[in-house]
Amino acid sequence: MLRRASIMHVRIAFIILLAICLSLIGRFETSAQNRSRANLQRRNTEIARMVTEIEARNIERTIRKLVSFGTRNTLSAQDNPMRGIGAARDWLFSEFQKIAAQSDGRMTVEKQSYLQEAQPPPRGRVPKPTIITNVVATLKGTQPESVNRLYVVSGHYDSMCTSPIDAECDAPGANDDASGTAAVLEMARVMSHYKFDATIIFMTVAGEEQSLLGSTYFAEQAKKNNLDIEGMFTNDIIGSSTSDTGMRDEHTVRVFSEGVPSSETEEEARTRRSVGGENDSASRQLARFIKEVGERYVPGMTVRMVYRRDRYLRGGDHMPFVERGYAAVRFTEPNEDYHHQHQNVRIENGVQYGDLPQFDDFNYIARVARVNAAALAALALAPASPKNVGLLTKKLTNDTELQWDANHEPDLAGYEIVWRETTSAYWTNSLRVGNVTRYVMKGMSKDNYFFGVCAVDRDGNRSPVSYPKPIR
């Protein structure tokens, strides 16, 4: 009897020990899969090399050349080869053509022009019909399944002094927005030597100071032609690291993104109010992606996400895109100097006014351009964000079941589910789930977390996150 009891005790101890071992193995496997987003990311060597090739001296050269045209007011001369917006337009077109000539035929350049009807003051800023021209360089993607997926980066090359309809005054616009224009041109120069799955559009627009005219026309045409623009960046006032109060910050760039989509329908609004998601628009996901990628590839730079569509009561060239349902964000320096913005060039009470190149920080602009380039490259190399992502709600349960449509990229490795606390600004956790289109997060209630899904290719390139809609 004693011997039988001893054998039974040994068996019980063995079973307990085996259960503990299996539990530890399970925990190890889970922890290996369920790691923080930061730990899961690895650097792409091509992107790392690309950002080092962006040079401040090229950006400075472009800014000084644009300033040399005296004014780039949209209403200024279009047929003068030395002064006015026409001279700036033609020079930019020529520079993009030089870049395209070195791209093995993958980049094309065009002038996108239209006749803007008069919108006279006080309501408008176009006293007479005016030709508006965007200079657009398109770097075609090399993967057939992704070539029609587009990413747009822009700066506006027009400028203004105190009055937006004064076409004669000097309006150097070194920061607003030769800085953004120069960043776009430098990105095109560097990135044209690389191949991407998706297509990237480098665009310099006119008419921004006349109420976003050039960008509105481009966005309207894109919507009309059903272009698949998955993300749009505008760079506007990225030139100075010092504010008018002397505050200096050389290592921060603000990225503005809207939460509730401008294009939201009433039905979509009702759903959002029922399930949350006011901080999970496509534009907000794009901003999170930029922060994650930009800070990974540009050491020392902080991408400060601002939960606004733009600065207080102000606007930029990303707005026509978000209003038409595209994900779009704005890059801007951390602290603006209003002595050098929309001012006639003058000295008053010992203070220099005017948007002059001497107030630009060319090294800072280069750092912002590197953040842009890293994010653009990561987007164009990654698979598309999963489509029709849904959270199944047919029955009450403390599990969370997600489903999505399959991607079609040939190099797709699978998908990743991400989640965060409802009070967290960023995705904090992720789980590789393989090449499936449905997955159940056991023991994780949809009431307590926000979930999302991204696609991952065989090289580890990840798409921006898609936020799910409820499926009843």
Where are these regions (language model features)?
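A non-catalytic alpha/beta surface segment that caps or lines the substrate-entry region
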Residues: R35-S36, N58-K140
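Active-site-adjacent mobile loop/cap segments within catalytic or ligand-binding domains
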Residues: V67, I238-E258, R304-P383
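Alpha-helical metal-binding/catalytic segments enriched in His/Glu/Asp
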Residues: A137, V153-S154, D158-L212, N372
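Short S/T/G- and acidic-enriched coil/turn segments that sit immediately N-terminal to beta-strands
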Residues: V184, G434-V440, Y449
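Metal-dependent peptidase/peptidase-like ectodomains
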Residues: V205-G316, A328
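Conserved aromatic anchor
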Residues: N398-D411
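Beta-strand-rich modules
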Residues: M441-R462
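Extracellular fibronectin type III
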Residues: R458-R472
